[in-house]
Amino acid sequence: MLKVAANGKLACISGCGNCYRPAGPMNADKLTGRASVVLVKTSDGSPGLRSSWLQNPKGNGVIAIGSRGLEDTISSARWVRLLNELESRRRQVSGRLDPVSKAELGQFLTPAPVAQFMTGMFAPQGRDISILDAGAGVGSLTAALIARFVGGPRTATRIRATLYEIDSALAQALERTMADCAELCATCGVMFEYEVLREDFLGAAAAALTLPLAGTSRTDFDCVILNPPYRKINGESETRRILTAAGIEANNLYSAFLAMAARLLKQGGELVAITPRSFCNGPYFKAFRRDFFSRMTLDRLHVYESRSHAFRDDEVLQENLIFHAVRTQKRPDAVVISSSLGPLDPSPRMWRVSYADVIHPRDPEMVVHVIADEAGRKAADVADQLSCSLHDLGLSVSTGRVVDFRARPYLRVNPDARSVPLIYPFNLENGYVVWPKPHPKKSTAIKSESATADLLIPSEVYIVVKRFSAKEERRRIVAALYDPDLIRCPAVGFENHLNYYHAEGRGLPRPLARGLTAFLNSTLADTYFRNLSGHTQVNAQDLRRLKYPSREQLLLIADRVGDDLADQIIVDRAVEEALELACSI
């Protein structure tokens, strides 16, 4: 067994008998013989990379490289050393970036374990491979991908890389990384060509696509690997003009990069990207989803369960996913979905889900259902049996009308004869709206007069749902029954951090409201919602997209749950029994 030390030397650290064991450490270039395994740790003590072709089962920050003869093993060791040096370089450069510029450009550089995981998704068929890396940073993704193609079981003979990086400081580091890759490719007998373009990717790519001759060196790529910038696009910007001219509708740079990159892939080409999950659902990304999936077919998804682990250095709390897609119209039977706590989780969970369960073929919005575990799969199966939309039930859902800072002159800390209840998220307790409920920073009532008439609704039976929750909360959907028998008043105001269900602006029949409240508080509904959305925000639009039990099923749920709308065991049993009974009739 050979160890690569911090000084780049190799030495046998066990009596394995499979490697040449000199009297002391030797340079990798001087070794002869055969080696079985090389173990590597980074010099600063941080977790090292894990090989994408031989995963380290212990997950202890050590690379395990299989024996393929000493020449291949030493070659792999050199790549490992380069990638670990590159990880240190990434941290140094990232720490020196100007925070203002970093925010403006949406820069979050890819950590080494994430890069290594992403490269493992590629399966190119040829040995002459062209790579596009847009927003390349210091080159972590491309370097890891080259190491995979050179050191993996299917060694490439020629690699061409096109890399875009607009930040001058990062571009300098990127040039250095590519020069290092070129040197190592030469020692491996692999022809390597690269081009670092210090220009705006979207503008340059749009220009390349309009060239009279197709098939230039800046189009028709075999592989695209992306950690695109994350920033909203100004409606009056040059970027917006470029995208419109290219036929791309995108509200964020990351979705714009994905849409443009898809156009640059050759048929059968592969794309792997790490992005926020937000594109998977919602009206803001509907046009993007239609555009992207008209060209690309999804076949792999990976979800990080923790918001903070993927980009720990940058304190990014966005929920991220990694996906692999192929430019083809042929849909696979299934999508492979996996999840892990973070990049260094040694035991990711993996399963296959029908493609039609991930992107429903008749869904005009092309929502991506991220079925993250077995519970998600079961919820998806049950949801397929739900028959009703809110419209079918004669119901609607709206966002609370009272924006408290705008209505401040009319708010009251203590209710009086001329005010009515103002309901906030903190008023939701054990399945019911509780009022009054003092709060140190919030009002409890709003003045009822002509100026506030449009902010209030009649005090009748409603279902109220929190719009915001922490990802780590037990339930994403938190619903409560507003019962006018418990809160005596002529009208009520719902604050803007709440959604409420109603029937054409008026209340619901009480039994129907109890059944629907219980359904929304069920584990089934919560898991179903998480399949649809990675947001901690529960928008009215999201609730409108859900499918619901029939009116008869909701009344069965109400009968079984009684008045207990918050006990999880009772609620889940009532929902399960009502849905099973209705299906058996």
Predicted feature descriptions by range:
Residues V4-A6, A11, A23, A28-D29, ...:
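Acidic, Ala/Val/Gly-enriched low-complexity intrinsically disordered segments
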Residues C12, C16-C19:
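Cysteine-centered motifs
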Residues C16, K30-R154, T162-C181, A205, ...:
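Class I S-adenosyl-L-methionine
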Residues A103-E104, F108-F117, A136-A143, R158, ...:
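Signature of N6-adenine DNA methyltransferases within the class I
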Residues I129, D222, Y462:
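Conserved acidic residues
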Residues M178-T210:
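S-adenosyl-L-methionine
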Residues A375-S584:
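Polybasic, glycine- and aromatic-enriched phosphate-binding surface used to engage nucleic acids
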